[in-house]
Amino acid sequence: MDNSTDFNSLRGLSVFLLGMMGSGKSTLGELLSRRLQYRFFDTDILIERVAGKKIREIFVDEGEATFRELETQVLAELSSLTKTVIATGGGMVLKPMNWSYLRHGLMIWLDVPLEILVKRLKQDTSRPLLQSTDLDSKLELLLEQRRGLYAEADLRIVVSDLDTPTDIVEKILTAIPTVIKDFHPERDHN
């Protein structure tokens, strides 16, 4: 698929990648932004810049509620941009206010099976919500809490263990034109 077709079909609309931690939002966001010739932002990195500390430190020092507030502030700023791919935090969908910002763009859910998430996150010590707990059970609980919210996305991309990041980006680029025609004019930001 050629880049100009992808770019034109989006008409400058930003793309929000949604999904669980470990679903590949940051990696895929960078690749997708290059293919679309868009800018790329990762909300977790921006939150760390705004707070002047790592996410884990925000959770420890100030709690999850403060982190979620920072997350909303960053999302509010990003939602006004066009031609941008945004990797969101896994819990971005939990706060109702965030949906008003997410609806400014095309929301894509990276639906990764629990077994793959567990495999990817087993050695990751940087995720505050996974500390001092049974990884499988915690991820299963988080996924159950969030699955219905993720399903509100405009597009669902099912990821398998065999998919490379490039394969997944190709799935996204192929699927975008199937949902763009269904957008309401008030959602199309040129």
UniProtKB/Swiss-Prot annotation:
The keyword Transferase applies. Its main location: cytoplasm. SUPFAM superfamilies: P-loop containing nucleoside triphosphate hydrolases (SSF52540). One of its GO terms (molecular function) is shikimate kinase activity. Its EC number is 2.7.1.71. The keyword Metal-binding applies. Mg(2+) binds at S26. Binds 1 Mg(2+) ion per subunit. One of its GO terms (cellular component) is cytosol. Substrate binds at D44, R68, G90, R146. This is Shikimate kinase. The gene is aroK.
